[in-house]
């Protein structure tokens, strides 16, 4: 990433842009509100502004850093499909720091992860709770990791209903179906039995990184990045 001074020098000397205009642009690009969203990338000139998450996509990295809803799920599914079309043999990495969210939206991400050809590695960078924990353990076996102070939490699906008694019964049956699906998924990827997952998930079941490894939610705890 280039510095503000280097960018200004290039714009004025090489592109003939006046200093006033450059200063206005630079104040926008390097302002506090932009620091976490964009980077300035140099690739054989000219410089270009790139959304930081788009830049990570170029390295086949997807970031799930918010609650899971339909909007986020659609984006992640589209990113997975796009990266598969770009290279069906190269791994994809999903970094997860999420409290969970919609089970239906999360299952869409899960099914896409299992459907595409590239191996999907999952890395927890802070918290993977509820539906996010399901996605974490659903990564390629041997490629599921978490940082040292990662927290992983599993529990039974949450839901509610109102209206006529028959409608409430229908909703309750659907929640029970989702519960079984989620427990089957966790059991399949963690190596635990369905009964163990059912018992542990009756209430919020929190695990630190090493406990998540012992449980089978991840394969390795990352403490120091290995030099390239």
Indicate where each model-derived feature is located.
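Terminal-region recognition feature
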Residues: 1-228
């Amino acid at each position: 990433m280039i510095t503000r001074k280097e960018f200004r020098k290039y714009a004025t000397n090489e592109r003939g842009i006046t200093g006033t205009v450059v200063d206005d642009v630079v104040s926008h690009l390097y302002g506090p509100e932009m620091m976490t969203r964009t980077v300035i990338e140099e690739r054989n000139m000219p410089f270009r502004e790139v959304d930081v998450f788009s830049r990570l996509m170029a390295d086949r990295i997807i970031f799930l850093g918010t609650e899971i809803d339909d909007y986020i799920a659609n984006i992640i599914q589209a990113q997975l499909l796009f990266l598969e079309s770009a290279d069906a043999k190269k791994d994809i990495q999903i970094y997860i720091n999420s409290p969970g969210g919609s089970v239906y939206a999360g299952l869409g991400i899960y099914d896409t992860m299992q459907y595409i050809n590239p191996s999907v590695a999952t890395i927890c960078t802070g918290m993977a709770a509820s539906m996010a924990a399901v996605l974490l353990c659903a990564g390629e076996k041997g490629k599921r990791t978490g940082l040292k102070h990662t927290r992983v939490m599993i529990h039974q699906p949450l839901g509610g209903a109102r209206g006529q008694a028959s409608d409430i019964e229908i909703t309750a049956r659907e929640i029970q179906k989702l519960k079984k699906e989620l427990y089957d998924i966790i059991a399949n990827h963690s190596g635990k039995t369905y009964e163990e997952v059912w018992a542990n998930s009756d209430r919020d079941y929190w695990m630190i990184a090493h406990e998540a490894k012992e449980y089978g939610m991840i394969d390795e705890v990352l403490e120091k990045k290995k030099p390239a």
